[in-house]
Amino acid sequence: MPEDAAVAGGETGALVLFSGGQDSATCLAWALDRFPHVETLGFDYGQRHRVELDRRAALRQGLTALDPAWGRRLGPDHTLALAALGEISDTALTRDSAIAFARDGLPNTFVPGRNLAFLTFAAALAYRRGLRHIVGGMCETDYSGYPDCRDDTIKALQVALNLGMERRFVLHTPLMWIDKAQTWALAETLGGRALVDLVVEESHTCYLGERGARHEWGYGCGTCPACDLRAKGFSRYLAARAE
């Protein structure tokens, strides 16, 4: 850790969970609009759609080009390897298997404990970097039913992390109560159509890691649950914008 990391971040610095997807890219813009120093963190857990991690550099570069102030605020990027999470997760996100729904209603893309692990490691890194604020793209409004995306889960984890690390971390989830259409609209509010275009072109959401097919909302297979949510949200966003 650089000696001046704590000084650069301090009590007002933020760490953004940054996968390279639409939600995390929007959250990064949200954080850059609010905090004077922002660092990013991605996780490699053997995910099938690892291509999303490869999009992070282009997104970071694009965001700094959109606003000089954002460029000054954007700090280092970090990547942590969590191979063990992939090894114990027999899911469609970590195995070459068809996406389906289980009897309990959860899709087999659910990786048990993923967000719990992500936020715990993020807090450990934030502790070392001297950053108080942790930003994630979890959402309870327009999601696949993942229990670790729920607001109650995040609030409970914030309490546990603060008790376990003797800190006063603040977990921010700016997308928690908005749907995908509103997420696109938030991007426009933060950075205009230029940010929307950046998210369309450079972010990746598709669970299958498909990067060959280009749609008006971005790249992906067009049929997996992630593509479906993104496509429908983009369509509703355009419709609302035209009113």
Swiss-Prot record:
The lineage of its organism: Bacteria, Pseudomonadati, Pseudomonadota, Alphaproteobacteria, Hyphomicrobiales. Zn(2+) binds at C206, C221, C224, C227. This is 7-cyano-7-deazaguanine synthase. HAMAP family: QueC. PANTHER family: 7-CYANO-7-DEAZAGUANINE SYNTHASE (PTHR42914:SF1). It comes from Methylorubrum extorquens (strain PA1) (Methylobacterium extorquens). Pfam families: QueC. It is an enzyme of class 6 (ligase). Pathway: Purine metabolism; 7-cyano-7-deazaguanine biosynthesis. Coiled coil: none annotated. Its EC number is 6.3.4.20. One of its GO terms (biological process) is queuosine biosynthetic process. CDD domains: QueC-like. ATP binds at F18, S19, G20, G21, Q22, D23, S24, A25, T26, C27, L28. GO terms for molecular function: ATP binding; ligase activity, forming carbon-nitrogen bonds; zinc ion binding. It comes from the Bacteria.
